[in-house]
């Protein structure tokens, strides 16, 4: 996520939730992971974060981040990507990857058992941005 900053890089993206083995890094190919859900602002537009406060990007309180599940499975990881991202290995595609769970994960959902055709809302989400020391 080097470049103009994390907020402008992630704004306008989408959260893709997958089942399967989480790649070692966000630069790696998705491999055999299965896309379960794509979460967007109001289900259709790119997500946008509030301005950073004390190094934390936060989902805006009134924003509705949701998506309809396109497959059934157990959610294991997510990526925040731009809509054109193919999931192939890349060191230049802006991506953020993390774990999915119901507690103590990078993205906590009400359930990790997603069912095709049902919605998956993201009710709260934040990213800690820490300064890198020289």
PLM-predicted stretches and their roles:
Residues 1-78, 83-134:
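Small cysteine-rich, disulfide-bonded extracellular modules of the LU/uPAR three-finger superfamily
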